[in-house]
Every structure is written in structure tokens, then in C-alpha cells.
């Protein structure tokens, strides 16, 4: 049975980067998100051993980003796999657990590579994708290779194509425009990050794993723009809780050309997630201090 392509949304050819942005429609959200992210980052700066203490948040980000992609697992399974793993990936391990652990490792490796002076380029993204899909179900989905046939985003239950990304024939041109935007745009960092995430998702350059790479780019780009002192910002929780709105706002860019609606949604997501991350970080820090005092 074939999928119905009637009324499917098509990629916005010729509409990237956006020609006009109306800041009056989201200036309040931009200020709130900037403030919330700054307060969260200050907490990171004041937290000793933050890489270790924020491990539970990092695990949850990998879990939720993979869940949005369709991967299902539990936190206990992830922790058990991490504890047992010796650096190699066992083919006996549960596939979805492997995918989530690989997400964590890919993000950590990306930080190390960028920290050494490497730039965010097409080759960097391909290497990130190769690490993400190294094993598990993704191993058969051409890790590190861009699509060569048209891909689709579909509602499998209704057998309906919801979105048609850019064609393979136009992909290189689309990626070149995205890389140029990343390196040359002078837009406010949060607005720029919103546009980068949307465009990568719209291009959907890989056979699989596009959403996870796209969400990694949010954290990595905010870090590169110096809005984060370290790449420890986890936004998938908000996207998971508001999945329908998340997808609708992204689709409307291609459907109606409304970048402002998407940017406003993204800023609301950053604001809400930064506040939540700050609260969780403070709880983790307080628990650490409490336990430390008990053992001194």
C-alpha cells in the first residue's frame, strides 16, 4: 500500500535564509530566554565538577531526544549499559539503549573536537552522524552519508506523507547555504540558533537520525556563540512535552513561510527549559553539598 502525498508540506525552496524577521513579534520572548539562559549558565560556572553532576540531565537528554526520534528505552537500562560497557558496543545489547548511549558519546566527542579549534562544517556533521549511528538499528542507515534518494516524514498509522524534505539533487546547495549562514550571520545568537535548527530539520540530509543531530546542533551552537560556558543545555524535554506544537511550528515555515512563529516557539522553549534546567541543577548541587558534608 502506498502513502498518500496529498496535502503534504514541501521544503521551502528559495526561502532560506529568511529575508525578513519581525522582532516585534517575539522581543519579549527573546529577552526572557536570554535572561533565563544566562542565569542557568551562571549556575554552571559556579558548580564544581559540573560534567559529573549533570550526568543525569545528559542521560535524560539522550533518552528524550531519542524518544522524539522514535527510540524507546528506560533510564535504568541506559545506566546499566554504561556501567557494563568496556568501550566497545555489544551486538547483544538492546538496540534502543545502544542508540541512546551513542547519542551521549557523539555529543561529548563533538565538544572535544570543537574545543580543539575545529569548525562546524559539513564534514563535522557527517562525522557526528557516523558516531551517532555507529551501531544498533542505525548501523544499516548509511552512517555519515547524506541521502541519495528522496526521504519523507510520514504518519505511518494513516499512511500519509506529512513532509517532503529537500531533494537529494538540491541538498548540497542547501547545506552550503546553511554553512554560510552559520559562519556569516550576525543575527542575535538565539534567533540564529532557532533558524539553524529549523533549516537542518527541513533539509533532513540523512536517511535517519536527523532530529537527534538537529537537537545536538542547538547546544553546540549556543556554546560556540558563547551563550553557554560549556555545552550542557538540554532542550529535548520541552520538545517532547510539546511535540505537536514543535512539529507544527516547524512545518509552518515550509507551508506558509512564517519564520516568526517558529522563532517565537523556539525562544519559549529555551526560556522554559533553561528555568527547568536551572532548578534541576540547583537540586543536584544541593544534594551534592549535603552528601559531601555527611562524609567530611
Question: Where on the chain are the PLM-derived regions?
Answer:
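FIC/Doc superfamily catalytic core
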Residues: 1-296
